[in-house]
């Protein structure tokens, strides 16, 4: 009888196990690589922070803060929260460690789990995996374009092509107050429910992010921020678009876009993939020029993004593509006997030192069982070593794709395999 554990992963928290975890690693690493090629340094952030950091940084009226955060009191009765996003934590770290007093822009990349209490569904988890970048300290449209192009390059390096970039401008401090008044005037004239009216009073932009069809219909004629930009904000956005054109990054201007976090200003963007249905976003971000000062630091600008690793995997699946190599190893060793096992263990260590992924047949499972294990491993080559091979100082090398087997001198096999595996 098969035994089952009485424990399982919490609802909405996925496990990634072999062979599928190879896809996860490939997607994450490709997105990280795109940022590192642009000079972004790695930052590792705490899993939990002071709750006030997110309340102040993300916005107290946002759904993230009011409905989705995992918040609890620690044993010292301090209120802490599992991080729901990365930008606020990065800004806190930049201020705390004085990175803002060095060379600007500060360019950082990070990855890991983030936590939001949402209704679990495909690609929308309570523990979500993201890759993020932040570029802090320079208000330059070219930097906006660089950040966007990094995300675009990361997706394309995976072979993903069914996505599109949507972007808009949310204005700056010189034009947003007047737009806020216009929007509130419009919203207060609608038959809104009490909760939505409260949102309109606190932060009217949050109402534009309402996903309910009946509210979306009421908002059809709402004034748009992009039609009320200041001259400086308009010029900034036009320069961003010009840089994207020069970089060959395709885009669609979506004047109705509203991101779910309060700190965004000016350039705001999202990558969407229609193969994912209603939950089509695979990543997004924008500029947040007032956030650092709001958190107690210098009045420096910033721009960044968060890309969903889980959702990018679903987008690849929707296109019938795969990014990961499910093979656990390049070479699988099958020793026949104790003397052969001792020699094979040493050979495996030599191959690994040469950068070759190697696994061995352990447990005395017999030749037939060992060869089945070799086949399941996905290895390109299987090494077979017995007493006769030891006596002749050779080893059998089987190409698992063709079935061809040859004898190679033991002293040469590391160089031969390294050369053939590239």
From Swiss-Prot:
GO terms for molecular function: ATP binding; histidine-tRNA ligase activity. Keywords: Aminoacyl-tRNA synthetase, ATP-binding, Cytoplasm, Ligase, Nucleotide-binding, Protein biosynthesis. It catalyses: tRNA(His) + L-histidine + ATP = L-histidyl-tRNA(His) + AMP + diphosphate + H(+). It is an enzyme of class 6 (ligase). The keyword Transport does not apply. CDD domains: HisRS-like_core, HisRS_anticodon. Coiled coil: none annotated. GO terms for cellular component: cytoplasm. Gene3D superfamilies: Anticodon-binding domain (3.40.50.800), Bira Bifunctional Protein, Domain 2 (3.30.930.10). Its EC number is 6.1.1.21. Its main location: cytoplasm. It comes from the Bacteria. It is found in: Cytoplasm. The keyword Aminoacyl-tRNA synthetase applies. InterPro entries: aa-tRNA-synth_II (IPR006195), aa-tRNA-synth_II/BPL/LPL (IPR045864), Anticodon-bd (IPR004154), Anticodon-bd_dom_sf (IPR036621), His-tRNA-ligase (IPR015807), HisRS-like_core (IPR041715), HisRS/HisZ (IPR004516), HisRS_anticodon (IPR033656). GO terms for biological process: histidyl-tRNA aminoacylation. Belongs to the class-II aminoacyl-tRNA synthetase family. Homodimer. This is Histidine--tRNA ligase.
């Amino acid at each position: 009888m098969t035994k089952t554990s009485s424990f399982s992963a919490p609802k909405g928290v996925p496990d990634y196990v072999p062979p599928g975890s190879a896809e996860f690693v490939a997607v994450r690493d490709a997105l990280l690589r795109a940022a590192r090629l642009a000079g972004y340094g790695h930052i590792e952030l705490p899993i939990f922070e002071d709750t006030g950091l997110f309340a102040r940084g993300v916005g107290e009226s946002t759904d993230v803060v009011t409905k989705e955060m995992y918040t609890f009191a620690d044993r010292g009765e301090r209120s802490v929260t599992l991080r729901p996003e990365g930008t606020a934590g990065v800004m806190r770290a930049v201020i705390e460690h004085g990175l803002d007093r060095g060379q600007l822009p500060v360019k950082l990349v990070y990855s890991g789990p983030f936590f939001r209490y949402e209704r679990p569904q495909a690609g929308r988890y309570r523990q979500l995996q993201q890759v993020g970048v932040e570029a802090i300290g320079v208000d330059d449209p070219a930097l906006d374009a660089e950040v966007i192009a990094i995300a675009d390059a990361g997706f394309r390096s995976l072979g993903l092509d069914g996505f599109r970039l949507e972007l808009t401008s949310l204005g700056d401090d010189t034009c947003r107050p007047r737009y806020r008044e216009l929007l509130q005037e419009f919203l207060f004239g609608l038959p809104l429910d009490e909760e939505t009216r409260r949102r309109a009073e606190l932060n009217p932009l949050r109402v534009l992010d309402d996903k309910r069809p009946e509210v979306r219909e009421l908002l059809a004629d709402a004034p748009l921020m992009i039609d009320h930009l200041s001259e400086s904000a308009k010029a900034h956005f036009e320069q961003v678009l010009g840089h994207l054109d020069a970089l060959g990054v395709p885009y669609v201007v979506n004047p109705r876009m509203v991101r779910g976090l309060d700190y965004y200003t000016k350039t705001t963007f999202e990558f969407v993939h229609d193969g994912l249905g209603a939950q089509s976003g695979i990543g997004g971000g924008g500029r947040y020029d007032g956030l650092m000062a709001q958190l107690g630091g210098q009045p420096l600008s910033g721009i960044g993004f968060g890309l969903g690793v889980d959702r990018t995997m679903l987008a690849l699946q929707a296109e019938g593509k795969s990014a990961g190599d499910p093979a656990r190893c390049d070479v699988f060793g099958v020793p026949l006997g104790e003397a052969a096992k001792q020699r094979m263990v040493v050979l495996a260590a030599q191959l690994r030192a040469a950068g070759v992924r190697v696994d061995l047949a352990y447990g005395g499972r017999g030749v037939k069982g060992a060869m089945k294990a070799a086949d399941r491993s996905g290895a390109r080559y299987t090494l077979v070593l017995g007493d006769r091979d030891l006596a002749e100082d050779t080893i059998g090398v089987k190409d698992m794709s063709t079935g061809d087997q040859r004898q190679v001198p033991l002293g040469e096999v590391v160089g031969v395999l390294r050369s053939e595996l590239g």
